[in-house]
């Protein structure tokens, strides 16, 4: 966490020079305080702001925050006790909280909220509004905000009293949890609530839930204090969290993540997650490999290519070029031209990869996947003996390669050498696929597990469900090849697949939606990234309409995921179609002549994009700076709806607005994950993920003018 704080301080130093026209948003950052910061082990029972400095209390005494450390003041902490109130009815039960509001004392009890009258008499408050009427239970939190409004937290939810009228909130309105422990006001009417399972901030009727290790050292919150800068100091049963909310711009956030990738995620030009030797400690990071180094490097390269197209920054061009040549190396190192490796590592790599991916490993996997490929070694030696490369390459890798090659060719490749290099590698891969009957063929002479794009595969028991996606991908690869190389043979091959094998018809259903086990989230990446090349380079107006239908079919299923990358890809391609219509590209009366009404109906229907970019904006702004993979459990929340789809796995759902929960409240730190998974774990604190998670959707959206900069 210290590294994140340091980087944030650099960003905040430069934020004073933000240009007036740049969009500014608030970025939350959590710093976990424990033994290394001077606090005792265990529970922090109280936190107060004294002379605008935090003071924490535990069973070991009091500790003051001085010069970024907790220092004991050698005073013993006193237990928190509530005063005795005379006259409170016995049926009210135990007093749990109290506040003085407008010259009146209010107490929260086990069985109600009470207001003191004259002569030690008490009146029970029964809050109501247009939606609810409550006899409150377990009123454990009371506070008054900076706008002089009374707030409570109770079993039923939370309430706010303003000018004599109540406004009540439950899970339907956004309250995430209701076993309250405390409340504390901030500035501009903002209020924090602590619960037995996390904390949340209410800001202008918007709820921000802060729970799990990304935000808190322990979910049981004992106390909260807000300082004059708006920083929340949250005391828990296992340490303290400091949550800072600071102004930031998109470009500052991009600079932060580019620095993060370059410092901790660059392995010989390949980009992926890293490993943490010590849980949650990014200072113990170690370079790692993934199954899809090529795809992830391509995505980082695409981010830098879009950045270069926007800014002409030489650094962006350098990083985009480095990514391209890393991808080309993956293709050049293998057993025959055009077969891309998944991964390249030096022979002295710190993990015994072939022992890990042994024959026994293959046998175990075949029990769950009968079509798992039994190949050994999975990391053969390079010809020069200096490297190992991972085989059994999948369609994921191809999707990443082709996605980037088109973008690189169009936006970055300026010299003859660069243009010839991208032309050659695209030709090599595409020729390999054609030569082997539209299959990726490994060094054993057999197709890889996920590398078949041929008609026989589509019409088989093991490939029928991949038909739409893989047919569309193959047509996309051929479109990219035709565009980049200028060779007409690739269009001729594509025409044969369309006319003789109906690949263009299959492509209209480019993604499986049901049963749920077939709707895997990474297929959304493969589908949308491949559609990007297919649509951008398609010259035939009838097929443009067909592929626009395919895009909408693929998009609607994931349109509520709050995935800024998928939103951006859809928005870019839908905008491309709109532009084509405006340019007069389509002559409806000449298209689909068997039914001359069809083309116009499709153009009218799909002319406007269905993207609501509010959710893309929300996600880009709320992507956390901390991309450690945490165990994030949201199954207990009051503001969720479980997915009732037949055959759906347990623990799937979304917010009560029917959209995925906000990005910083779920364990979603990769671009190809399902945002409706309510309990997610991406490494359990032993991996940090690369900043491509922000960089690619941001620069893609900026390049295609989908967000306000």
Can you describe what each PLM-predicted range is?
Residues 274-276, 280, 318-466:
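Extended ligand-binding groove/face enriched in aromatic
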Residues 53-56, 104-107, 149-152, 190-193, ...:
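Conserved beta-propeller blade signature
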Residues 252-279, 320-335, 424-442, 489-510, ...:
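Long, well-ordered core segments of solenoidal/helical folds
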Residues 238, 243-264, 527-709:
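Terminal, non-catalytic domain-edge segments
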Residues 21-54, 59-70:
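An edge-strand/N-cap motif at the start of beta-rich repeat modules
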Residues 154, 195, 236, 292-308, ...:
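Well-ordered alpha-helical segments within folded domains of soluble proteins
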Residues 31-50, 74-101, 126-147, 170-188, ...:
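Short coil-to-beta transitions that initiate beta-strands within beta-rich domains
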Residues 222-248:
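Blade-level signature of beta-propeller repeat domains, shared across WD40, Kelch, NHL, RCC1
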